[in-house]
Amino acid sequence: MCPQKLTISWFAIVLLVSPLMAMWELEKDVYVVEVDWTPDAPGETVNLTCDTPEEDDITWTSDQRHGVIGSGKTLTITVKEFLDAGQYTCHKGGETLSHSHLLLHKKENGIWSTEILKNFKNKTFLKCEAPNYSGRFTCSWLVQRNMDLKFNIKSSSSSPDSRAVTCGMASLSAEKVTLDQRDYEKYSVSCQEDVTCPTAEETLPIELALEARQQNKYENYSTSFFIRDIIKPDPPKNLQMKPLKNSQVEVSWEYPDSWSTPHSYFSLKFFVRIQRKKEKMKETEEGCNQKGAFLVEKTSTEVQCKGGNVCVQAQDRYYNSSCSKWACVPCRVRS
């Protein structure tokens, strides 16, 4: 039985929804300007105030334009294109006083832009997977160009009963992903639910938001899920082959070390098939029971195997989870 959740992490009450204004602060000295990207839109009026007690002889520059662009403690600009974004700096007598960095968040025909990330085949931008029910999971996303990118992923629910999650720093994976004959870079991040109870029924989903920055562009993406819906076990381990009569062999395996315990409660089922020579095993998202595979609910079975490999993959026994990758062992039967 799991202890009752008595405390609420500050991370659970972060409100990601933008205030009802054209400009809001993302972090210190960095602001997001929400811009209507339709051609006839007038742009957004933004006031920038120099952080100084000084009042006179203040000038402004922008890293997007040459020379002095304004004077006075407050600079009023119209933001309607990326040339209007970037860093604005106020000066006095050759001394830098303060600066503000503007990022653009584009909206066209009522839809926020989603240009930084590439969606996966199932039309989602964020793909999350958990190897067990511990509350630990990994989320990944794809980008076409790895240039001047920054990411921040966090809990997006404002409910006091929400499931608090802490995520690490996003990192670039060595894995390249090919979609529609184009190669994409893959980023991933590890997350952990702050308070977990693997045996409890999930009633509220985990809600996450990813903030993405590329040069002077800002976008955000969201996802929600139950841990049970993103389960993908690791492959079975320690596959062993025992020759029997003729071409018959007994293949055995063990649960992956990462899988939840006790196994009597968190049970796996397995799919077994023969991999012929030069045949490639396909990993599918839709289900485990591929053509030629058969179901095994224990950790051994007998098969006829005269060449190639015996391959095994795992799936949650009681819930239609994703399948593990295949684990294979050569037949190596005696002639």
Curated annotation (Swiss-Prot):
GO process annotations (BP): cell migration; cell population proliferation; cell surface receptor signaling pathway; cell surface receptor signaling pathway via JAK-STAT; cellular response to lipopolysaccharide; cellular response to type II interferon; defense response to Gram-negative bacterium; defense response to protozoan
Superkingdom of the source species: Eukaryota
Keywords tagged on the record: Cytokine, Disulfide bond, Glycoprotein, Immunoglobulin domain, Secreted, Signal
Domain Fibronectin type-III, first and last residues per copy: 233-324
Keyword Glycoprotein (UniProt): yes
Single GO term (MF): growth factor activity
Record-annotated disulphide pairs: 50-90
All copies of domain Ig-like C2-type, residue ranges: 23-106
Pfam families linked: IL12p40_C
GO cellular component: cell surface; cytoplasm; endoplasmic reticulum lumen; endosome lumen; extracellular region; extracellular space; Golgi lumen; interleukin-12 complex
Gene3D superfamilies the UniProt entry points to: Immunoglobulins
Alphabetized PROSITE patterns for the sequence: HEMATOPO_REC_L_F3, IG_LIKE
InterPro entries (UniProt xref): FN3_dom (IPR003961), FN3_sf (IPR036116), Hematopoietin_rcpt_L_F3_CS (IPR003530), Ig-like_dom (IPR007110), Ig-like_dom_sf (IPR036179), Ig-like_fold (IPR013783), Ig_sub2 (IPR003598), IL-12 (IPR050676)
Chain positions carrying an annotated carbohydrate: 47, 122, 132, 220
Signal peptide: 1-22
Localization of this protein: Secreted
Family affiliation: Belongs to the IL-12B family.
Summary of subunit composition and partner proteins: Heterodimer with IL12A; disulfide-linked. The heterodimer is known as interleukin IL-12. Heterodimer with IL23A; disulfide-linked. The heterodimer is known as interleukin IL-23. Also secreted as a monomer. Interacts with NBR1; this interaction promotes IL-12 secretion.
The protein's role, per its UniProt record: Cytokine that can act as a growth factor for activated T and NK cells, enhance the lytic activity of NK/lymphokine-activated killer cells, and stimulate the production of IFN-gamma by resting PBMC. Associates with IL23A to form the IL-23 interleukin, a heterodimeric cytokine which functions in innate and adaptive immunity. IL-23 may constitute with IL-17 an acute response to infection in peripheral tissues. IL-23 binds to a heterodimeric receptor complex composed of IL12RB1 and IL23R, activates the Jak-Stat signaling cascade, stimulates memory rather than naive T-cells and promotes production of pro-inflammatory cytokines. IL-23 induces autoimmune inflammation and thus may be responsible for autoimmune inflammatory diseases and may be important for tumorigenesis.
PANTHER family noted in UniProt: INTERLEUKIN-12 SUBUNIT BETA, INTERLEUKIN-12 SUBUNIT BETA-RELATED
Protein name: Interleukin-12 subunit beta
